[in-house]
Amino acid sequence: MAKNIQAIRGMNDYLPGETAIWQRIEGTLKNVLGSYGYSEIRLPIVEQTPLFKRAIGEVTDVVEKEMYTFEDRNGDSLTLRPEGTAGCVRAGIEHGLLYNQEQRLWYIGPMFRHERPQKGRYRQFHQLGCEVFGLQGPDIDAELIMLTARWWRALGISEHVTLELNSIGSLEARANYRDALVAFLEQYKDKLDEDCKRRMYTNPLRVLDSKNPEVQALLNDAPALGDYLDEESREHFAGLCKLLESAGIAYTVNQRLVRGLDYYNRTVFEWVTNSLGSQGTVCAGGRYDGLVEQLGGRATPAVGFAMGLERLVLLVQAVNPEFKADPVVDIYLVASGADTQSAAMALAERLRDELPGVKLMTNHGGGNFKKQFARADKWGARVAVVLGESEVANGTAVVKDLRSGEQTAVAQDSVAAHLRTLLG
């Protein structure tokens, strides 16, 4: 017997029972995006490798350790996208969407990183990202955060996420802080773990979010990033905080929040939770005003965020059990008798025409009434429409409310109207 081929470790199948809750959550997210006037953009999952090296940074963990990179048959180096911002910027430049224009875009889809799989962290994972181009004030930063807060309310998880904010300043201010931080860390080099020693010279700001408690204790005496901010960044951050306070959105300033990708400047933020163990970041982003120019476009202010959908689904299921998946089926059409199947299928098509948006499943494969009603229950149907030989002969159908058990014989021409009343 041939050996079964299984999914790649860290790349998961999502089965029908799971995709239903994903669809409801994604529908909620998309409705909110539409209410803010954001437009969808669809992007390739494979890009040229230099795009990510230039955008994310050569010495980041993502580029050094985590990217799925391969050579195609033409000898070109290609990479499965590890994040969405770089590809979105590339598309904006390529198609002339950015220069002297405002764009509010969102995308959704799989990303790929070669990490150690664990709950909430996978090698293929899904993100929803938002990117705004052409606006440089703190008001658009605030709008993005307000948009995410509206998501949490719609999903019933507001009490389980908290907002952390920081400003990492301009590129020049960050370079000055980098020098001061390296000078500090060099004094305690023997107390750093190997990962922090490596990062100290390649990407020292990443030492700030080390998970090592001994390193975190050491950093209590480190120079504060806030002391090195340029005046424009201070004013921008103060304006953002004021807007969030006016909107009633609570936040904490976390001066060790830096984000793991090199393209960020000024505002950075994360929504975090204590309900998912070590994988506490649900949504994160910030400003990247230099990235468009860095990738070959004209200087364009930009801000955005990405949200991990696997973690969001886990969080919703953990803290809001009332948020249920929509039923697969609203109406189940039961047909019994040798000559009823074609009539049942014809009635089903007519009902789909008259009741757009209603989910109707027709029984196939035979079975007595008991078996067919069991199938209706399995699929979560609220109503059954029953056709037997006598109903076909009389031009009627029996409509049964599967919750109350009440049933009514109805002329086939009136079934749609009766169902509208039952389904509300």
Curated annotation (Swiss-Prot):
Assigned EC number: 6.1.1.21
Biological process annotations from GO: histidyl-tRNA aminoacylation
NCBIfam families: hisS
Entry-linked Gene3D superfamilies: Anticodon-binding domain, Bira Bifunctional Protein, Domain 2
A cellular component term, taken from the record's GO annotations: cytoplasm
Principal place of residence: cytoplasm
GO MF term set: ATP binding; histidine-tRNA ligase activity
Signal peptide boundaries: none
GN (gene name): hisS
Subcellular location: Cytoplasm
HAMAP family, per the entry: His_tRNA_synth (MF_00127)
Alphabetically ordered keywords of this record: Aminoacyl-tRNA synthetase, ATP-binding, Cytoplasm, Ligase, Nucleotide-binding, Protein biosynthesis
Stated name of the protein: Histidine--tRNA ligase
Cross-referenced PROSITE patterns: AA_TRNA_LIGASE_II (PS50862)
Subunit organization: Homodimer.
Record Pfam families: HGTP_anticodon (PF03129), tRNA-synt_His (PF13393)
Catalysed transformations (reactions): tRNA(His) + L-histidine + ATP = L-histidyl-tRNA(His) + AMP + diphosphate + H(+)
Family that this chain belongs to: Belongs to the class-II aminoacyl-tRNA synthetase family.
